[in-house]
Design a protein with these regions (language model features):
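Short linear recognition/processing motifs and adjacent strand/loop elements at protein termini
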Residues: 2-31, 43-46, 53-319, 326, ...
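A short beta-strand segment in extracellular, disulfide-stabilized domains
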Residues: 33-37
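Soluble non-cytosolic domains of exported or imported proteins
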Residues: 140, 144, 150, 335-343, ...
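Extracytoplasmic/secreted envelope proteins and their assembly/folding machinery
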Residues: 75, 342-349, 372-375, 416-423, ...
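Solvent-exposed loop/turn segments at secondary-structure junctions
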Residues: 325-327, 365-369, 391-397, 413-416, ...
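Active-site histidine-acidic residue metal-binding/catalytic motifs
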Residues: 300-385, 395-398, 402-404, 494
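Active-site-adjacent mobile loop/cap segments within catalytic or ligand-binding domains
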Residues: 385-388, 395, 407-410, 436-495
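Sec-exported extracytoplasmic/periplasmic mature domains
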Residues: 161, 346-357, 379-383, 414, ...
Length: 495
């Protein structure tokens, strides 16, 4: 029993075995053991799964870590019993042992030799202004992390199709993988797989590069003939824009810098087929965005907010995202994740508004909001920060008795500090194990204009933690942790 959690209420009803996970007939993804959870109707009952005694909480919830069923009996045998009653359930599942080894996998490959010109999602070619929400995702390998966020209409060289992915070349030194549906070519023909022949490419000419400033950002403006492939990389106090397959020469293409308190230095250089713009900043990177508008690539480097040390949150715009629906994890007694995350999110809103924050909610009802719409809401609100509220669950094969607690997630480096301050504030409020801060490629953490994090306050599949988050007092604790973490984060920007 965790003394930091509210007491689990007692339930003593008729025995009724209800398995929540795995779902009936589902394929169990683990190799030899897995968790099974649900409820039995009475906290006074004992429960065995395939002869293994598993714990039952006072509210009748159970969670067991048991061996997978053997190949010749693809089910769990559950027996719940009290002094006066017994209930049995044969619960069917599937395991790897039961379905046999996977057949060898051979990908479907189409190789182009020589490579051919391709346009990334050319349905956007008629537009002269790009939206940062409409990008093509690039990876270093078919299953790799997202590293490139390319403009629609970018011209690349198509090297091969592999199943639903396409390998394209940004310049002779850089191949990446994109979704095959994002690639449009005039002619597609299958040829035998050979090494692509080298082909002379026409470089995009950088016509002019200059800088400008506003109250919100310092902007790099690079005039080019068409949308180039690019990548933005960042350190703690520096940011670099690399334009692939470009050439900048002559006085007209030199960077015209400006004097600005955010910029320590600004340089332009050339490396092989690339034009590189590097900015050393006087303060840590807070946010940025990359646009292609009217023939100009814009890198906007966001200024950190002006913060009152006495009231660090006042005047900020913060987007609160109660995680899910349409999907979400479910606990042993049937509590669905979107229900308590909304309750916590609304409490976060109220606490933030009391501190002078303009709060934008991604949802205030049970109606589903698409995952991709949530960061769009935040960017269009010009948010100063984004926090998504979730409840965790283990993957098949992970023992939840060993792996549970509180953790936070980020994707871009400028969000790591926010993830840490929120975690530091949540752990004492919730009283659970500190799992740490994790780098992970999550959709709601990918925006670059503002720090964005996702909080997994607890594990809803743990019976005592599921019972706790049903209570208003524990929802309050989660909300306080989020708000205190946000306040600590913005206090670091106070002068």
């Amino acid at each position: 029993m965790n003394p930091h959690l509210p007491q689990v209420p007692g339930v003593d009803g008729p025995l009724d075995i209800n398995v929540v996970y795995p779902t009936r007939g589902a394929l169990v993804g683990s190799r030899d053991s897995n968790f099974v959870f649900g409820s039995v109707g009475s906290g006074l009952a004992a429960l065995k799964i395939d002869g293994h005694l598993v714990p039952v909480w006072p509210n009748g919830a159970f969670l067991g870590w048991v061996p997978n069923p053997p190949a010749d009996s693809q089910w769990y045998e559950l027996v719940a019993y009290t002094l006066s009653d017994t209930a049995r359930l044969r619960y069917p599942v599937r395991t790897r042992a039961g379905i046999g080894p996977r057949p060898p996998y051979t990908p479907e490959v189409t190789t182009f030799s020589p490579s051919v010109d391709a346009i990334l999602r050319n349905d956007s070619l008629d537009r002269t202004v790009s939206d940062t929400d409409d990008v093509i995702i690039g990876r270093p390998s078919p299953a790799g992390d997202y590293e490139w966020f390319l403009f629609p209409g970018t011209v690349v060289r198509l090297l091969e199709y592999r199943d639903d992915m396409a390998r394209v070349q940004l310049d002779p030194g850089q191949d990446i993988w994109v979704d095959r549906r994002d690639v449009k070519v005039s002619t597609v023909r299958k040829v035998r797989k050979v090494r692509p022949k080298k082909k002379t490419r026409t470089h995009l000419r950088v016509v002019h590069a200059s800088m400008s400033a506003s109250h919100a950002s310092v902007d790099l403006n690079v005039a080019v003939a068409s949308a180039p492939a690019y990548i933005v990389s960042e350190g703690d106090r520096d940011i670099t824009l690399t334009l692939y397959n470009t050439i900048a020469s002559g006085a007209s293409a030199r960077l015209v810098p400006i004097t600005d308190p955010l910029i320590q230095s600004a340089t332009q250089s050339r490396e092989s087929d690339r034009t590189i713009y590097h900015f050393a900043l006087t303060r840590p990177v807070y946010g940025y965005e990359t646009l292609y508008e009217h023939g100009t690539v814009k890198l906007r480097i966001r200024r950190p907010p002006i913060v009152d040390p006495a009231e660090p949150l006042r005047g900020m715009t913060i987007v609160v995202d109660p995680g899910h629906p349409p999907i979400g994890a479910t606990g042993p007694t049937g509590l669905w994740e979107p229900v308590p995350t909304l309750a916590v999110g609304l409490k976060v809103r109220d606490l933030l508004e009391a501190r002078g924050v303009h709060v934008v909610m991604t949802r205030t009802t049970a109606a589903p909001v698409a995952l991709g719409d949530r960061p769009i809401i935040a960017r269009r609100a010009d948010a100063n920060a984004f926090v998504s509220i979730h409840l965790n669950a283990d993957a098949d094969g992970q023992n939840p008795f060993r792996d549970n607690g509180t953790g936070t997630y980020y994707f871009h480096p400028q969000s790591k500090l926010l993830a840490q301050t929120v975690l530091n504030a949540l752990v004492p409020e919730l009283g659970l194990r500190d799992r740490g801060v994790f780098y992970q490629n999550l959709a709601v953490c990918r925006p670059t204009w503002f720090p964005a994090v996702l909080a997994e306050g607890l594990f809803i599949i743990m019976p005592d933690q599921e019972a706790a988050i049903r209570t208003p007092e524990y929802q309050d604790a989660y909300a306080r942790g989020v708000v205190n973490g946000l306040e600590k984060f913005f206090a670091t920007f106070a002068k």
